[in-house]
Amino acid sequence: MSAKKKPTITKQELYSLVAADTQLNKALIERIFTSQQKIIQNALKHNQEVIIPPGIKFTVVTVKAKPARQGHNPATGEPIQIKAKPEHKAVKIRALKPVHDMLN
């Protein structure tokens, strides 16, 4: 019972679509996307929030430390020890209202 894979726009397809829509060449589009990625990475390293219009929000969140705990192997029911996880940072990506409105 395998789920059908949703169609995905690849990076190269995205570059081609943007190039066709803006009438700019693909090399320039690729440089723009690469620059955008670097800017987002730099902002997140400095704990800055980034919003990409029309409404995708990137934030850095701190995930609390989790202590070691007892669990069980779901296949065998055998008890296992789950390791503790230290506090760490993660990126949270959220679609804002304008993006949700696009779907309705």
From Swiss-Prot:
The keyword tRNA-binding does not apply. GO terms for cellular component: virion component. GO terms for molecular function: DNA binding; structural constituent of chromatin. Stilbene derivatives SD1 and SD4 disrupt the binding between pA104R and DNA and inhibit the viral replication in primary alveolar macrophages. The record marks R69 as: Important for DNA-binding activity. It is found in: Virion. Keywords: DNA replication, DNA-binding, Late protein, Virion. The keyword DNA-binding applies. It comes from the Viruses. The record marks K57, R69, H72, P74, K83, K85, K92, R94, L96, K97 as: DNA-binding. Its main location: virion. DNA-binding protein that plays a critical role in nucleoid compaction, genome replication and DNA replication and transcription. Binds to both ssDNA and dsDNA with a binding site covering about 15 nucleotides. Displays DNA-supercoiling activity only when associated with the viral DNA topoisomerase 2. Host antibody response against A104R protein is higher in asymptomatic than in chronically infected hosts. This is Viral histone-like protein. It comes from African swine fever virus (isolate Warthog/Namibia/Wart80/1980) (ASFV). The lineage of its organism: Viruses, Varidnaviria, Bamfordvirae, Nucleocytoviricota, Pokkesviricetes.
